[in-house]
Each structure stands twice: as structure tokens, then as C-alpha cells.
């Protein structure tokens, strides 16, 4: 079971984020599934449609995102993953002009998998801090020439 869950989570990151497939969200995220902590620490997204709305916003800002999974730990129906997202801020979907900065975001996701779908995801990342730094860079032409990591 845990190897199947591991494979599902690997497919999730590869297809949903790296290949940007909305069909994969419908396939792998349970209808009543909940995603906590994305995009903000106190956010709760319920179901594929809610997740797809945020997914589109995120890809609108970072269309070249690529996530690399690092540690993957499986136990029963839970899969924990540490990951790094590398991307360039190229769009204005976050509500401010693109800075064209290359950025990285480290995170950890703990997912609950049942019957081949993700039913819960708890995400831990510093998205708010990243957006704050990008907003500051957008407001300052000097900072906009520097790379954030």
C-alpha cells in the first residue's frame, strides 16, 4: 500500500505541478478532499475545483514552476514529502506586476491517501514571506534586479 501511495504522490507533484495538468487534479484529488496551508498557512481548499482556482492563480504568477521532491516517508495512509519549488515570477496573478525574479520555495506536505486519491494535504511553506519579498521587489526597481532565493 505505501509504495502505491508513494507513487500517487510522486505523480501528483509531477503531473499537477511540473506538467500543470488540471485533469490530474480531478483524477487524484478526492471530491471532498481538503488542502490546508496553501496558498496561506490558514487556507483550506475543499475539493478539486477549489484547488484548481488557486492552482491557476499560482501558475499565472509562476508559469515555469518545477518542483523537486526530496525526502518521501510513507506510513499506512500517510505520505510526507519535503520539496523545493524553483520558478520565475512572470505574471501578475498575485495582484502586482511581475518582477521577473527567479525564486525558490521550500516546503513539506503531509498527505492522506485512500483508494487512489488524496483526501487531505497539510502544507507547510513560507508562501506569505515569498509574496511579501516579491511585492517589495515590484515596488523597488533596484531590488527587482536581484534574485530571491
Q: What are the residue ranges of the model-derived segments?
A:
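C-terminal and inter-domain tail/linker signature
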Residues: 1-149
Amino acid at each position: 500500500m505505501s509504495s502505491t501511495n508513494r507513487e500517487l504522490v510522486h505523480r501528483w507533484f509531477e503531473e499537477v505541478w511540473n506538467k500543470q495538468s488540471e485533469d490530474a487534479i480531478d483524477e487524484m484529488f478526492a471530491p471532498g478532499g481538503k488542502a490546508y496551508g496553501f496558498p496561506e498557512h490558514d487556507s483550506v481548499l475543499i475539493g478539486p475545483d477549489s484547488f484548481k482556482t488557486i492552482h491557476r492563480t499560482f501558475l499565472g504568477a509562476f508559469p515555469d514552476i518545477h518542483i523537486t521532491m526530496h525526502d518521501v516517508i510513507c506510513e499506512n495512509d500517510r505520505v510526507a514529502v519535503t520539496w523545493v519549488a524553483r520558478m520565475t515570477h512572470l505574471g501578475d496573478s498575485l495582484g502586482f506586476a511581475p518582477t521577473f525574479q527567479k525564486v525558490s520555495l521550500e516546503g513539506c506536505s503531509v498527505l492522506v491517501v485512500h483508494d487512489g486519491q488524496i483526501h487531505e494535504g497539510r502544507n507547510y511553506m513560507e508562501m506569505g514571506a515569498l509574496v511579501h519579498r516579491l511585492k517589495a521587489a515590484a515596488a523597488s526597481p533596484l531590488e527587482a534586479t536581484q534574485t530571491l532565493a
